[in-house]
Amino acid sequence: RQTMATEGELLDVIVIGGGQSALTVAYFLKRAKLSFLLLDAEEAAGGAWRHGWHSLTLFSPSAWSSIAGWPMPPVTEGNPDRDHVVSYLEQYEARYGFPIVRPVSITAVERTARGLRVRSKDRNWEARAVISATGTWSKPNVPAYPGIELFQGQQIHSAQYQLPEAFQGKRVLVVGGGNSGAQIYAELSEIADATWVTTKEPAFLP
């Protein structure tokens, strides 16, 4: 297991994030025998999957959803769900013993004479290179549109969606043709008056 960085130590790489992208980067950094550290804002392993809606499921089987080095364990039926993915990421992280500090919120990255300094509220770290693997879940993009201030109903992003029961019997418009939009629409259409809007013809439904 790689040891944590000491105060003032110059690392080869600092990775900001702790989800699957960060873990994949860490795998190859470890193989290259570089000194590195992951700084994760989450309380525990799993990245954005820890915040996914309850029925969130991958669109691909375990064998096609693995990250480098260690295959995702198979599921008994269907495709992996949220909890299975979180468990896999927890086991993956422990398997390789990556050095991770959490929870830590990064406030700035700045250049120094030696390389780059990564700042948090309580501590600084230094490295020759910094990789951002923070994803987009914590800052979802809610598009602006004319008349948005006139809408009196509820508007949320898929990042805030949790359970379909909150929309039972309501009129719901799901906007977006990606996997999230397709999966949420399929679930809501069973209990709500749901309509799905996409910019182009969707290829398939879950």
What residues fall within each predicted segment?
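Glycine-rich active-site loop/strand segments that organize a redox cofactor
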Residues: G47-S87, W196-P206
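A Rossmann-like FAD-binding core segment of flavoenzymes
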Residues: V104, A108, S189-P206
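Glycine-rich dinucleotide-binding loop and its adjacent helix/turn
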Residues: V75, D81-H84, T134-A194
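Conserved Rossmann-like nucleotide-cofactor binding loop
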Residues: S21, A44, S180, P202
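Short, Lys/Arg-enriched N-terminal segments with co-localized hydrophobic residues
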Residues: R1-T3
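Feature captures the FAD/FMN-dependent oxidoreductase FAD-binding
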Residues: N79-S138
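N-terminal Rossmann-like FAD-binding beta1-loop-alpha1 element of flavoenzymes
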Residues: G8-L38, G181-S189
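Short beta-strand "acidic-cap" motif of Rossmann-like dinucleotide-binding folds
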Residues: L34-A41, D193-T198
